Amino acid sequence: IDNMKDIYIRSVKKLAYILINHEVDYDIQLDRYNNTVFVLEDTEEVRELKNRYEHCVRQGSGLPVDLVKFLDQCRELRAEIREVKGSE
């Protein structure tokens, strides 16, 4: 969990996208914008968390903190998380 800080720092600097596996088109969504993308397995709990996270984004409230909380909760659910980076 040392890399949580690293993820946090990067999420402050860039928008981090939360995607469900089947929504991903890597070429379009990663390379063009050079964003960090967290790809999650498609479970009901993950969907619920994703909706809550996106609600926070819309409200504009403490986004980076919400991202860290979101990822923590996904880990608690033992959700598979893959982090994919766009080309630098």
What name fits each language-model region?
Residues 49-88:
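C-terminal basic regulatory modules in eukaryotic proteins
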Residues 1-29:
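Short, charged/polar N-terminal "headpieces" of proteins
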Residues 14-16, 37, 69:
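Intrinsic disorder/low-structure terminal segments
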